């Protein structure tokens, strides 16, 4: 992600911390564990097991997987649960084993894959926990991996909220027959991939080893900082002097900005970070990158507009007083 410097600024290492060097106690409360969800338990049960293994008060999952579905399940630990809403709308990727109910040529199958790539209509299945109204979902990629008789293995990258079971059934109908999903595995969920996953037993062993031997090496390999799960979002990096004000609920103003992502659009959700890379919170950008830089050049000529916020803060991750107070209350 390319960053543009608005104003060079240095950070003071007497407060705050590089996210990847947080003390293990802080990491446990501001971290993410990406579990390889087994077939059988619900996503909620897996999250509860992670919470209990790590002796935490709270753990929540991002992107529910049905009990029989396996694969990438990001679990947010305590304070990181505030990030879950950001994960809900990110694209997902699956590998699905579909069984067709009649013989089909590979060429015919590829034509259907092409037809179902792009915007499609879906109605949630009967067992879905949402209203069964017709909705539009986007299929970004459909790739045939293997075909053995009537069994078809394919990879799909899709918009969040896409029902793969329904997709398989609809493709079968388009082929002039019927089809059903036999197995499903999630391999990507936004920034999380199969390279990040661990088994519940590995997590248990690493935690026990830390508690009994004081060695946190393996536990650190498993628990990722909160910021790892926010790397897909465009960001605005603020000066140390602006951090505590934002932690107390202030919006982001132009004079507090040091750097920002190149491609920020107006009304886009953006991450607010410190110069050390710590997540402060998220908000809605009120100006795009081009206009932020334009306002910076004109700040002397346009003081009134300069006083307007450029980001409307929606959710704060960082605790107040992590950085010293460097702001004054209006009289």
Swiss-Prot record:
Residues 233-307 form the PUA domain. Could be responsible for synthesis of pseudouridine from uracil-55 in the psi GC loop of transfer RNAs. Keywords: Isomerase, tRNA processing. The active site is at 66 (nucleophile). InterPro entries: Dyskerin-like, PsdUridine_synth_cat_dom_sf, PsdUridine_synth_N, PUA, PUA-like_sf, PUA_sf, tRNA_PsdUridine_synth_B_fam, TruB_arch. It catalyses: uridine(55) in tRNA = pseudouridine(55) in tRNA. One of its GO terms (molecular function) is RNA binding. This is Probable tRNA pseudouridine synthase B. Transmembrane segments: none annotated. GO terms for biological process: box H/ACA sno(s)RNA 3'-end processing; mRNA pseudouridine synthesis; rRNA pseudouridine synthesis; snRNA pseudouridine synthesis; tRNA pseudouridine synthesis. The lineage of its organism: Archaea, Methanobacteriati, Methanobacteriota, Methanomada group, Methanococci. Belongs to the pseudouridine synthase TruB family. Type 2 subfamily. Its EC number is 5.4.99.25.
């Amino acid at each position: 992600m390319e960053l543009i410097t608005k104003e060079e600024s240095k950070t003071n290492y007497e407060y705050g911390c590089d996210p990847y060097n947080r003390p293990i106690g802080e990491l446990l409360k501001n971290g993410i564990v990406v579990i390889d969800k087994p077939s059988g338990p619900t996503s909620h049960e897996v999250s509860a097991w992670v919470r209990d293994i790590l002796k935490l008060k709270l753990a929540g999952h991002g992107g529910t997987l049905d009990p029989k579905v396996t694969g990438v399940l990001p679990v947010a630990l305590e304070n990181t649960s505030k990030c879950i809403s950001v994960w809900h709308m990110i694209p997902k990727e699956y590998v699905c084993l579909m069984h067709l109910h009649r013989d089909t040529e590979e060429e015919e199958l590829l034509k259907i894959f092409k037809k179902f790539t792009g915007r499609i209509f879906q109605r949630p299945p009967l067992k879905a926990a949402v209203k069964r109204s017709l909705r539009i979902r986007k299929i970004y990629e459909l790739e045939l991996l293997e075909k053995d008789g009537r069994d078809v293995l394919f990879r799909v990258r899709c918009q969040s909220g896409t029902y793969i079971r329904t997709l398989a059934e609809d493709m079968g109908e388009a082929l002039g027959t019927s089809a059903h999903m036999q197995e499903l595995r999630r391999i990507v969920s936004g920034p999380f991939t199969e390279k990040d996953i661990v088994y519940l037993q590995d997590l248990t062993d690493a935690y026990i080893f830390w508690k009994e031997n004081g060695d946190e090496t393996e536990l650190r390999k498993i628990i990722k900082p909160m910021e790892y799960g926010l790397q897909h979002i465009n960001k605005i990096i603020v000066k140390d002097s602006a951090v505590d004000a934002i932690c107390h609920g202030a919006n982001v103003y132009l004079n507090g900005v040091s750097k920002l992502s190149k491609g920020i659009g107006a009304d886009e959700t953006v991450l607010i970070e410190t110069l050390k890379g710590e997540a402060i919170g998220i908000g809605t950008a009120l100006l795009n990158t081009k206009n932020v830089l334009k306002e910076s050049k004109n700040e002397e000529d346009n003081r009134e507009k300069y006083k307007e916020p450029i980001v409307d803060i929606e959710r704060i991750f960082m605790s107040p007083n992590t950085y010293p107070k460097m702001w004054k209350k209006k009289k």
